[in-house]
């Protein structure tokens, strides 16, 4: 038997959080469900054998126990209940009754015996920072995480914790994104690991845009991100991550300042003629205080002039329009510095104040002679 009562809003929020880690399809039916454990409170878990999310909510438990419910149907039932106190009852045969106001649902559940335990994360190292900071860092780097399984290590983001703070790096072979923030709470000294990109997308969602803290724990094989009453556990990615420090060129004699919004608008205009079927690089001619942009495909030709500050020394270089726009869009600044060398050298985007809290690198695309 399981019996508890809880506010609908709390259950709905918890179900939404853990459902993101539930397997869509599995040979183990329990993995398509949410594990509910009743003891001193109510704990809900979702696990797809790669990533697990569990959270605890306040509930009045009259009979302790555990049961598994299909995540999709349970979520739909809870969502449709009126905003009131929900009463949950399950008998010895795992038949479930949900009551809330005048509404009720009945549904068979599953035994929790077949539900695999989430991995235990042995605390080797940990670091604590504000949730809004980690949320922003993931958002501003995860777009550059590789989706190419040929290099599994690059399907995640590198976390480096040192006296410089927390550095996050993502790379996909065409671009690199780096964010750095100072830290106050480090337990265990310097350490580093690679977290899967898919798991980080979920970490971004469980982190609130507040100064509440999140703790990141590195274990031998797994990682845990703990924000309030919610924990996300995932595997560490193993392998040799790119030596990003040596991959970033340091000789960049051309340096111009760019207003992000203005350049994104110019790129967006010339990108109108570019499509998935008709791809073409954006041709950029960096001149004195302006960049001449153009693109030509079977859809037509587009041109624009973007004002900048600095001498581009008549450098002509091509870029993938989306990669350059992403770097400008996710850079946490209104104005950035673009550093260039030759038409076949990467473009480096950094803060105008020479701080090291972000860096984006975009590789060029070879241009055909016109």
PLM features per residue range, with description:
Residues 1-370:
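Structural preference for solvent-exposed beta-strand-turn elements
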